[in-house]
């Protein structure tokens, strides 16, 4: 499973990339607003750090405008994937952009039927939001299971399942066990994956024991 980082914070992206686990990046208007930077300058800098798919989101609502915006975003860098909101207009735009060879990531997917439409339209990625479904007492991971089952039934579907709205390491583990193609993770979840209380306790004990190990005497200084 590939890991993308869900962030527009360049320093977070640098730190996660240094861990060797980041295969791509997803951004959205909310993340850009959080860092207070413009879309194009941020995407260009991210592309200079991570050599992988970088999702940049359209904010138009009509198909014609989404297509125009998508073309503009795709020109920023070869690694840009155009993020399209789910819906009738989004499907029209996805089909058109795909026909032009522009990669797409359909976002805000909350049902298997929506994911089926994304595959039919030729989307590169579909982004089901598991955390937001959990928030309303639905099972986000059950949706991932259903989408994967449907996609595996049809060999001609090439759309990758990009698990989004990931809240914790359990979501990551569940996505990996189900065989999702990608999970996009906030920086704090990436760091949580590396931690375990028994690891911390073991390191603490090893360091304490090391202090008890006799050390070789330093050779006398040359005169």
Swiss-Prot record:
Gene3D superfamilies according to UniProt: Aldolase class I (3.20.20.70)
GO cellular component, one term: cytoplasm
SUPFAM superfamilies: Aldolase
Active-site residue list: 83 (schiff-base intermediate with substrate)
CDD domains reported for this sequence: Transaldolase_FSA
Principal location class: cytoplasm
Keywords: Cytoplasm, Pentose shunt, Schiff base, Transferase
Protein name as catalogued: Probable transaldolase
Taxonomy of the source species: Bacteria, Pseudomonadati, Myxococcota, Myxococcia, Myxococcales
Gene that produces this protein: tal
């Amino acid at each position: 499973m590939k890991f993308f980082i869900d962030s527009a914070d360049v320093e977070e992206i640098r730190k996660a990339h240094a861990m060797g686990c980041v295969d791509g990046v997803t951004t959205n208007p909310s993340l850009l607003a959080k860092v207070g930077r413009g879309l194009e300058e941020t995407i260009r800098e991210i592309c200079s750090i991570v050599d992988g798919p970088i999702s940049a989101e359209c904010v138009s609502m009509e198909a014609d405008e989404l297509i125009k915006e998508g073309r503009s975003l795709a020109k920023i860098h070869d690694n840009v994937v155009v993020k399209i909101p789910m819906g009738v207009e989004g499907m029209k735009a996805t089909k058109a952009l795909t026909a032009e060879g522009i990669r797409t990531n359909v976002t805000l997917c909350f049902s298997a039927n929506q994911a089926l439409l994304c595959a039919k339209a030729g989307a590169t990625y579909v982004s089901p939001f598991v955390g937001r479904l959990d928030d309303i007492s639905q099972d986000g991971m059950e949706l991932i299971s259903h989408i994967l089952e449907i996609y595996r039934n049809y060999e001609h579907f090439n759309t990758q399942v990009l698990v989004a709205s990931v809240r914790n390491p359990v979501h990551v583990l569940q996505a990996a066990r189900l065989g999702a193609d990608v999970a996009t993770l906030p920086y704090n979840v990436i760091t949580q994956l590396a931690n375990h209380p028994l690891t911390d306790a073991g390191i603490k004990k090893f360091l304490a024991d090391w202090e008890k190990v006799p050390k070789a005497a330093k050779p006398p200084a040359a005169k």
